Every structure is written in structure tokens, then in C-alpha cells.
């Protein structure tokens, strides 16, 4: 199972760290994903859901 929100589609994104000399080094930003039990097709299942989806009420825990 990929680390991706099943509701909003949020996932890890890539970019650069920049030093004072503007040198670039690769880094990643992880989405705030929580593993929760929700109803999927009427059955409880553990999936990754973003914290924003939980706070906004787009998904309800079981």
C-alpha cells in the first residue's frame, strides 16, 4: 500500500534544500498521513488518510 491519502490523493513530494550559498540538495516533504480504519465498500479497512481529510470530516473513523 502506497503512502498516499485515499481521499484527497496527497502524497510525498520532492524538491530541494537550499543553503546560504544556494547549493541544492534533494529532499522530500511527507504528507501528514494517519493510518485509520474506515468503511470501504461497507467493510472496515485500514488505510492512509491525510490529517486534513480527517479534520474536515471528509471521512469518518470506524
From Swiss-Prot:
Keywords: Ribonucleoprotein, Ribosomal protein. GO terms for molecular function: structural constituent of ribosome. SUPFAM superfamilies: L28p-like. Part of the 50S ribosomal subunit. The lineage of its organism: Bacteria, Bacillati, Bacillota, Bacilli, Bacillales. GO terms for cellular component: ribonucleoprotein complex; ribosome. Belongs to the bacterial ribosomal protein bL28 family. The keyword Manganese does not apply. It comes from the Bacteria. GO terms for biological process: translation. This is Large ribosomal subunit protein bL28. HAMAP family: Ribosomal_bL28. The keyword Metal-binding does not apply. Coiled coil: none annotated.
Amino acid at each position: 500500500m502506497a503512502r498516499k491519502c485515499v481521499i484527497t490523493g496527497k502524497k510525498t513530494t520532492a524538491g530541494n534544500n537550499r543553503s546560504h550559498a544556494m547549493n541544492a540538495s534533494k529532499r522530500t516533504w511527507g504528507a501528514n498521513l494517519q493510518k485509520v480504519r474506515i468503511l470501504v465498500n461497507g467493510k472496515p479497512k485500514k488505510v492512509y488518510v491525510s490529517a486534513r481529510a480527517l479534520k474536515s470530516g471528509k471521512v469518518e473513523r470506524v
